[in-house]
Amino acid sequence: MAVPRRKTSPSRRGMRRSADAIKKPTYVEDKDSGELRRPHHLDLKTGMYKGRQVLKKKDA
């Protein structure tokens, strides 16, 4: 059976667990509409992504 050779230090254990934390999502302000959106995602109101129209605009 595999057994660790050395005890894991609290510092190393904490560094390993730091990736498990829940991080809040980041938002950026859209240049054209001023709406908040996720980075690298399209704007659902305008249907634009990277300056191109990829979806038809929603009619309100």
From Swiss-Prot:
Asked whether the UniProt record includes Cell inner membrane among its keywords, one would answer: no
On whether Ribonucleoprotein is a keyword of this UniProt record, the answer is yes
Q: Which intervals carry biased composition (Basic and acidic residues)? A: 17-44
InterPro entries, per database record: Ribosomal_bL32, Ribosomal_bL32_bact, Ribosomal_zn-bd
Annotated GO MF terms: structural constituent of ribosome
- Biased composition range(s): Basic residues: 1-16
Keywords attached to this Swiss-Prot or TrEMBL record, sorted alphabetically, are: Ribonucleoprotein, Ribosomal protein
Source domain of life: Bacteria
Q: Where is this region: Disordered?
A: 1-60
Q: Which GO terms describe its biological process?
A: translation
Q: Which residues cross the membrane?
A: none
Q: Where is the signal peptide?
A: none
Q: Which cysteines are joined by disulfide bonds?
A: none
A single GO cellular-component term from the record reads: large ribosomal subunit
Query: NCBIfam families under this entry?
Result: rpmF_bact
Family statement:
Belongs to the bacterial ribosomal protein bL32 family.
Q: What is this protein called?
A: Large ribosomal subunit protein bL32
According to its UniProt entry, this protein's organism is Bradyrhizobium sp. (strain ORS 278)
